[in-house]
Swiss-Prot record:
Disulfide bonds join C39-C56, C46-C59, C55-C64. GO terms for cellular component: extracellular region. Reversibly blocks N-type calcium channels (Cav2.2/CACNA1B) in rat dorsal root ganglion cells. Elicits no toxic symptoms in either vertebrates or invertebrates during a period of 48 hours post-injection, when it was assayed in vivo by direct injection into mice and cockroaches. Residues 21-37 form a propeptide. It is found in: Secreted. The keyword GTP-binding does not apply. Belongs to the neurotoxin 36 family. 02 subfamily. Residues 1-20 form the signal peptide. This is Hainantoxin-X. GO terms for molecular function: calcium channel regulator activity; toxin activity. Expressed by the venom gland. The presence of a 'disulfide through disulfide knot' structurally defines this protein as a knottin. Keywords: Calcium channel impairing toxin, Disulfide bond, Ion channel impairing toxin, Knottin, Neurotoxin, Secreted, Signal, Toxin, Voltage-gated calcium channel impairing toxin.
Length: 65
């Protein structure tokens, strides 16, 4: 009886860990922290803090530097 319970617990642990690993890989692909950060290269026009994509450097005189 005890052996059946141990086998059942082991199988459940294996199923749960496989399921969690599969979902963690999906989360990594969708995570914005993992994705490459986009920024404007030097010479591109910029508009300060209100623009959606920031400069890679600094916005000076409406141009990224």
């Amino acid at each position: 009886m005890n052996m059946k319970i141990l086998v059942l617990v082991a199988v459940l642990c294996l199923v749960v860990s496989t399921h969690a690993e599969r979902h963690s890989k999906t989360d990594m692909e969708d995570s914005p922290m993992i994705q490459e950060r986009k920024c404007l290269p030097p010479g591109k026009p910029c508009y300060g803090a209100t623009q959606k994509i920031p400069c890679c450097g600094v916005c000076s005189h409406n141009n990224c530097t």
